[in-house]
Amino acid sequence: MVVVLAGCSAPSGTGSPAKAEETVVLGLGSEPDTLDPVLGYAADGGSLLYDGLVRRTPALDLQPALAEALPDVEGTEVTFKLRQGVTFHDGRPLTGADVAYTYTQVLKAANNSPIRGDYAAIDRVDAPDARTVVFRLKYPYAPILQRATLGIVPAGSGLTSGSAAPVGTGPYAFVSWTKGDKITLRANDRYWGGAPAVKKVVLAYTADDNARATRMAAGEFTAAELPPKAVARFRNQQGTTVHEAPTADYRGVMFPLGRPVTGDLAIRRALSLAVDRAAMVTAILAGAGTPAYGPVAPGTPWHNPAVAGPGTPDRDAAVRLLEEAGWKAGADGVRAKDGTPARFTLMYPAGDSLRKELALAVASDAKRVGIDIRLAGLDWDAIEPRMGEDALMMGYGTPFDPDYLNYELFHSSFAGQGFLNPGRYRDPEVDRALETGRETSDPAARKRAYDEFQQRISDDAVWLYLVYLKHTYVVRGDWSGLTVGVEPHEHATGGLFGTVANWKPAP
């Protein structure tokens, strides 16, 4: 990401701030579908509108937010005491009933919440009094506090997938949402954590990376997220600073496993041998990243180092593997097996220059071993219905507990549910490992389970993991309060942008 803060002109329609330090315009690439936590908005705590019972520090430690202290998590009952004096943006006091309502709405099957599976360990949430909330679990669940970052909404709130005014307890309150353009927020001067110095925040959305960089250079944004190569022109620009954040955010190719070519293990393994990950880091990420071989980031305690691949491609080994599996080279250089050419389509979101460049690199490397990859840059509405048929350059990743994302991406019960397990992967051993990791509280047993999970999906080459990114931010002006920490894939108003309530012009 890139964050730029200053007294520059506002984008069209945002209005000109009276004082630069009172208004910040953040240039973002991805607009949310909803601002409702029940429907998955910023469930991991990356929101300016909402608070959870707990929140994460930049170092990923958990600390109390709406809860007054971190509770004991032994057993199947976890009790939170709420912080006193907290009010919603509309003035209503926060009570235990609001917390119970929020989680109950997520768990209610009729609401079809996309994050419902994340809270499968919770049987119910009760509020015995105004300041007490009790999570009653189906089994001891080690990362339950990690799930307590969910933003809390007032009891009785309806699902707001459109632009209806959301209400939370966070440092900023909702003002307006112009779909396809911007969301405007105002400071919550009654915020329990202290009134923000920045009084107005505009989240300005531009999906195309190059267009967003151009708007940043033109001074339309006081902050913007950009891919690593796009920040190069800002590095030596007077008055701007580039910030790099370490992440668990990976890019890789999701294979539809029910198709003749991508469903062939030899094809998938050969591609993993053929691609030059180090070259991608150098040429595409401008050095702002590392090679990736799996969904659990190196350097995290849950990473299995046994799944790390070679530092350089081995295309001779890839060719041998394909030959032994019956994929023979044709006159046109494209391999075929039983009359089926080694050819498939790789989709990527059209406005994402980073994914486009990675897709081009994969296709180029694949061609060298006789695999023909056709590229298709599409919008997300066109991509989603094709995920069972065509490969996709995807991005995911979280530095939090390994139960996050991995269960939904690889457990067979989620096969084919939109962007959850889109490749329709089914493996009983992986299911058992993920279930053990989720339902066991013993750290050593969980580590063994997640090591087994990582090894199994590596052996199956379920995805072609390519790179872990650094999020790059550009900041114009001299500001205090900007804090960089380890970031997940979903970082919009989390990460560096999530600290905007602490930003102050440096004296």
PLM ranges: what are they?
Residues 178, 275-304, 354-363, 384-507:
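Detector for C-terminal structural segments
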